Structure formats: structure tokens, C-alpha cells
């Protein structure tokens, strides 16, 4: 009987601690700042996404980088390569329409142009 009460008390305590940890979790200030700017600005969705991506990628998480061990350096290099790839893709021009790709392209099939 005593062990059942003890188990119930420990279960209740763990639930209370879990709920307290969730409500006390810090929010990301960059996310809050981005949301405020996106509501205030009347820019297009693509510009906001590029801005947010650039802002996230410009500030690497220093706490993770400080705790790296030598075997984790290869993973850090891969993450840096992925970050550079994302920056390049964010800065690249959007896909052009088929007509803008090649001006001399006259291949078409049933009123639609094809990529030459």
C-alpha cells in the first residue's frame, strides 16, 4: 500500500515538473522579432522568407559550437556546408518561366510551350 502511494506521488510530481518545464521554456527572440517585422511590413512572402532565413543563418548557435569534441568537427563542417547551400539557394533567382528561358524556343504542344 505504501509503495503504491509512493509511486502515485512520484508520478504526480513528475507531471507537475514536466508542465512547469514546458511553461518556463524560453522563446526564441529572433522568431518573435521576425514575427513582429512580418506583421508590420507589407512585403511579399518570398522576401520575408529570404530575410528570415538569412537572419537565422547569420547568427550561428555559439553554445553548440563551444561544446564540440574533435570527432564532432566533421559534423560541424557538414552543417557549415549546408548553411552555405541554404544561403546560395535563398539568394538565387527564382525559376524563370519557360518563355523567358530561351527567346527563340518555338516548340509547343497544344497551346503550351515546352522547355527546349
From Swiss-Prot:
GO terms for cellular component: cytosol; extracellular space; GABA-ergic synapse. GO terms for molecular function: hormone activity. C-terminal amidation of the neuronostatin peptide is required for its biological activity, including for the regulation of mean arterial pressure. It is found in: Secreted. InterPro entries: Somatostatin, Somatostatin/Cortistatin_C. This is Somatostatin. GO terms for biological process: regulation of cell migration; regulation of postsynaptic membrane neurotransmitter receptor levels; somatostatin signaling pathway. PANTHER family: SOMATOSTATIN. The gene is SST. Keywords: Amidation, Cleavage on pair of basic residues, Disulfide bond, Hormone, Secreted, Signal. Residues 1-24 form the signal peptide.
Amino acid at each position: 500500500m505504501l509503495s503504491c502511494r509512493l509511486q502515485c506521488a512520484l508520478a504526480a510530481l513528475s507531471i507537475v515538473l514536466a508542465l512547469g518545464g514546458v511553461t518556463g521554456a524560453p522563446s526564441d527572440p529572433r522568431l518573435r522579432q521576425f514575427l513582429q517585422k512580418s506583421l508590420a511590413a507589407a512585403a511579399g512572402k518570398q522576401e520575408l522568407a529570404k530575410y528570415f532565413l538569412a537572419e537565422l543563418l547569420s547568427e550561428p548557435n555559439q553554445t553548440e559550437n563551444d561544446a564540440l569534441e574533435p570527432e564532432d568537427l566533421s559534423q560541424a563542417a557538414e552543417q557549415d556546408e549546408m548553411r552555405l547551400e541554404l544561403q546560395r539557394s535563398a539568394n538565387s533567382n527564382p525559376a524563370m518561366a519557360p518563355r523567358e528561358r530561351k527567346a527563340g524556343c518555338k516548340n509547343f504542344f497544344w497551346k503550351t510551350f515546352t522547355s527546349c
